[in-house]
């Protein structure tokens, strides 16, 4: 349920944005700042960067114990918000909690998963990541008819689930991999042989190549995905000429397809067939999906828009984000696995914030087709990088992968 509440908070904000704008009379700048500092962008980036370091220094369970309390505080500010500072503060605090939570949960899932079923276990987080938005959108379609109070209720249901998840986490043990790595580190410290981890460690040698590879796969792809997440209702209605109700149905349908794709494609096939081939297919259909929007508006037909929703939904559930979660956990050693994931997630969300600011200006100055061409280019780059550079890690333990890549255990 971790990914459910994390992704749900992003979509709940987008679904109620117009209601909050009417209630608070927000200016364009205030709305832009809200989007840029939300859990879909900058605040989550900072949360991931800080959370990753804490995860490696104090343990996965340490972050797990406290990050949802931060999340709940932010949610309470939103639910009871009566002015812009409360709303903005709530968004920022929620984002910090989401960023730290994503890193801790994705790292822990991979470390505790059996080697032969790692993709299946990692896919469970992606399943919840798609389920959360689908449920939130359905709730919003019904509750938003009651105005802003409806959106407050949507946020409130996430508080209840977060509190339940936090209570369940108190019973969880620490990661065995992290515990073993920490004990070894403490032994080396006593012997004066330990090498401190810094970001310079991650930005040199094989680690730098891995960071660049993961950014090529995920950061570039996320420019497309963040456009989908924030602007698709607008695009469906203003470019695709769909009604608001049909647009909402398309959005819900895409998330339903996403969690079905996660379960039936990534979780079932990610450990049983070539990941390079699977990535190549799923990444390729994403390029085709976005190519639809480069066509003149009068050429667009309903079957094309449905094809876009299906292809994009399949990719969102079993494509770049799922592989990023898996590879980021596999390709770095336990000693700084969470720090590395926090760094790449930070880069991804910061660039998403910059891109989110740029998209409206690009559409206003050059038209949406030009923006769509850029998005197709981003999707193609991500597809090629992942297909060419896909590591062969299927069925191997994290320790095996570490020794193959570094030539020794990283202590």
Task: List PLM regions with ranges.
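Extracytoplasmic gate region of multi-pass secondary transporters
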Residues: 13-14, 207-259
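Extracellular/periplasmic helix-loop-helix junction of adjacent transmembrane segments
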Residues: 14-46
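Conserved MFS/SLC helix-loop-helix module at the cytosolic interface between two early adjacent transmembrane helices
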Residues: 46-82
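Helix-to-loop junctions at the C-terminal end of transmembrane segments
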Residues: 48-59, 261-274
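Helix-breaking motifs and short loop linkers at transmembrane-helix boundaries and internal kinks
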Residues: 59, 80-85, 114, 296-299
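Structural signature of the two symmetry-related core transmembrane helices
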Residues: 62-76, 277-292
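Cytoplasmic helix-loop-helix junction between adjacent transmembrane helices
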Residues: 90-127
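Glycine-rich segments within core transmembrane alpha-helices of 12-TM secondary carriers
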Residues: 119-144, 161, 345-355
């Amino acid at each position: 349920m971790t990914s459910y509440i994390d992704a749900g908070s992003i979509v709940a904000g987008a679904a109620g944005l117009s209601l909050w704008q009417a209630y608070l009379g927000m200016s364009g700048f205030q709305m832009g700042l809200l989007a840029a500092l939300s859990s879909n962008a900058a605040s989550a980036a900072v949360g991931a960067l800080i959370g990753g370091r804490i995860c490696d220094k104090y343990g996965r369970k340490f972050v797990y114990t406290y990050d949802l309390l931060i999340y709940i505080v932010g949610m309470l500010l939103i639910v009871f918000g009566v002015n812009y500072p409360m709303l903005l503060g709530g968004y920022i605090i929620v984002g910090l909690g989401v960023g730290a939570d994503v890193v801790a949960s994705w790292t822990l899932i991979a470390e505790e998963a059996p080697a032969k079923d790692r993709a299946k276990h990692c896919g469970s987080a992606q399943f919840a990541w798609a389920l959360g938005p689908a449920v939130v959108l359905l709730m919003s379609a019904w509750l938003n008819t009651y105005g802003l109070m409806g959106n407050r209720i949507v946020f409130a249901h996430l508080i209840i689930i977060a509190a339940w998840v936090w209570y369940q986490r108190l019973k969880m043990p620490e990661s065995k991999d992290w515990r073993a790595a920490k004990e070894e580190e403490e032994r080396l410290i006593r012997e004066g042989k330990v090498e401190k981890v810094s970001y310079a460690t991650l930005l040199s040698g094989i680690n730098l190549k891995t960071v660049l590879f993961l950014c090529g796969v995920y950061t570039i792809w996320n420019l497309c995905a963040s456009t989908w997440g924030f602007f698709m209702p607008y695009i469906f209605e203003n470019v695709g000429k769909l009604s608001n109700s049909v647009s909402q149905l398309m959005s819900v349908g895409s998330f339903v397809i996403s969690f079905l794709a996660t379960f039936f494609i990534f979780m079932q096939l990610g450990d049983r067939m070539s990941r390079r081939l699977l990535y190549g297919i799923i990444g390729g259909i994403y390029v085709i999906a976005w190519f639809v929007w480069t066509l003149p508006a009068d050429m667009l037909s309903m079957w094309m828009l449905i094809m876009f929703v299906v292809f994009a939904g399949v990719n969102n559930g079993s494509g770049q984000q799922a592989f990023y979660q898996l590879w980021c956990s596999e390709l770095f050693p336990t000693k700084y696995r969470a720090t590395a994931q926090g760094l790449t997630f930070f880069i991804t969300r910061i660039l998403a914030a910059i891109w989110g600011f740029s998209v409206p200006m690009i559409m206003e100055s050059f038209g949406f087709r030009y923006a769509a061409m850029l998005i197709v280019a981003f999707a193609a780059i991500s597809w090629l990088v992942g297909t060419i550079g896909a590591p062969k890690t299927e069925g191997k333990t994290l320790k095996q992968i570490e020794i193959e890549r570094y030539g020794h255990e990283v202590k």
